[in-house]
């Protein structure tokens, strides 16, 4: 709680001018501070007065500001006070002003806890829903609550007040959505603060530190760097001066990469023609192992796809001992079949980003034959673009992805 809140919205009003010691003037009105006039210690007055005025903000000074003012008045009003005492008093007054300013906290920090989702405790990225009592849920958590209730054959309830929730009982809260879109968020490239509503455009089009590519990448230039260095690089790029034979070798490599990409998408289109296809949104939740040195892992609640019950697990850097000491971060996952099957179940599966997240995942198709004896796949890499995207996932309260399952029938 801030000093202003502890004082009940502000300290008492300043008394008559005659009650103030000689050489000290108390300013009235907004941002009232304490200024030192003539007499010893006057040099310390303006800085402390400005600091105290900022700490107090609009209205009257709070308790911390008044305490600093009293210390400054005592030292300034006593002509016999030693210079060291006057200096210490001035420093104490400025420290009290700084503490009062820090105690109040930024508005956006206080709003964060007010507007966050009651389930994942994170700020919503898309739609915001509320129960009949006004508790907020982001779209991803709202859908998960409904899906979990369907699997348990129960009525979905608000995790706060336990009132019933459904798509017909809950409504969107546009005011909260707009308020969240105006809250400041930090650009991952330049570390500046921008409203969340324009942050994506800033990172893609305006940020001078955003990662960009050379315009000669089509003829093989591999350069990646900040946008403000692009002009200098392109002026010195050697690829435009290469001979035709050199460029043909580069273009052959690019054609091979293009063929692999086309092969992947053709495989996905082929899977989409299968008779039995299932997909669902999955939510990886963080847990800790029971080891002496605990390790982070993720696991989803049980879900049903293709009339079978499944679970997904994930781990960081293949459960290495100290992943926090590594600059490279990776996630790997495995799919577990929890149902009993009467015959081998051959499936292809892949993970993609969920509908309410912006993580960058490249599609990779995995294949496995599930039986009662072999009911879990090996850990396979989650195809995240880079360590930056992995850190974004690890920083979130939960990881929301979409799983596709294709049953191969012989």
Swiss-Prot record:
A zinc finger (TRAF-type) spans 158-231. Residues 1-22 are annotated as: Disordered. A zinc finger (RING-type) spans 117-162. This is Zinc finger TRAF-type-containing protein 1. InterPro entries: Sina-like_RING (IPR049548), ZFTRAF1 (IPR039338), Znf_RING (IPR001841), Znf_RING/FYVE/PHD (IPR013083). Residues 1-13 have a biased composition (Gly residues). Pfam families: Sina_RING. The lineage of its organism: Eukaryota, Metazoa, Chordata, Craniata, Vertebrata. Interacts with LGALS3. Belongs to the ZFTRAF1 family. One of its GO terms (cellular component) is perinuclear region of cytoplasm. It is found in: Cytoplasm; Cytoplasm, Perinuclear region. Keywords: Cytoplasm, Metal-binding, Zinc, Zinc-finger. One of its GO terms (molecular function) is zinc ion binding.
């Amino acid at each position: 709680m801030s000093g202003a809140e502890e004082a009940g919205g502000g300290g008492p009003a300043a008394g008559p001018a005659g009650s103030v010691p000689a050489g000290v003037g108390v300013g009235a009105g907004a941002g009232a501070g304490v200024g030192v006039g003539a007499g010893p210690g006057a040099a310390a007055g303006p800085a402390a007065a400005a600091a105290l005025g900022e700490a107090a903000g609009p209205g009257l000074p709070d308790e911390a500001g008044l305490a600093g003012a009293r210390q400054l008045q005592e030292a300034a009003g006593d002509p016999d006070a030693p210079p060291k005492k006057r200096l210490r008093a001035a420093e104490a007054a400025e420290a009290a002003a700084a503490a009062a300013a820090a105690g109040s906290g930024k508005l956006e920090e206080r709003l964060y806890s007010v507007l966050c989702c009651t389930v994942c405790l994170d700020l919503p990225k898309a739609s915001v829903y509320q129960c009949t009592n006004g508790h907020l849920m982001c779209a991803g958590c709202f859908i998960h609550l409904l899906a979990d209730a369907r699997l348990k054959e129960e009525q979905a309830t608000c995790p706060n007040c336990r009132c019933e929730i459904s798509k017909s009982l809950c409504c969107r809260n546009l005011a909260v959505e707009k308020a969240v879109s105006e809250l400041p968020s930090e650009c991952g490239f330049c570390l500046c603060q921008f409203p969340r509503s324009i942050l994506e455009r800033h990172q893609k089009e305006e940020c001078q530190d955003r990662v960009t590519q050379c315009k000669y990448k089509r003829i093989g230039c591999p350069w990646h760097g900040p946008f403000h260095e692009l002009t200098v690089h392109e002026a010195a790029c050697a690829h435009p001066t290469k001979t035709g034979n050199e460029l043909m070798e580069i273009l052959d490599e690019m054609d091979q990469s293009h063929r692999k990409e086309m092969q992947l998408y053709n495989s996905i289109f082929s899977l989409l023609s299968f008779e039995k296809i299932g997909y669902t949104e999955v939510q990886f939740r963080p847990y800790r192992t029971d080891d002496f040195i605990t390790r982070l892992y993720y696991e989803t609640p049980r879900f049903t796809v293709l009339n079978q019950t499944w679970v997904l697990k994930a781990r960081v850097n293949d459960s290495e001992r100290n992943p926090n000491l590594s600059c490279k971060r990776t996630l790997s996952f495995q799919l577990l079949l929890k149902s009993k099957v009467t015959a081998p179940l051959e499936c292809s599966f892949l993970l993609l980003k969920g509908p309410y997240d912006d993580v960058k995942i490249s599609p990779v198709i995995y294949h496995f034959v599930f039986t009662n004896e072999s009911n879990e796949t090996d850990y396979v890499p989650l195809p995240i673009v880079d360590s930056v995207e992995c850190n974004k996932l690890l920083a979130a309260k939960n990881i929301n992805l979409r799983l596709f399952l294709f049953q191969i029938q012989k």
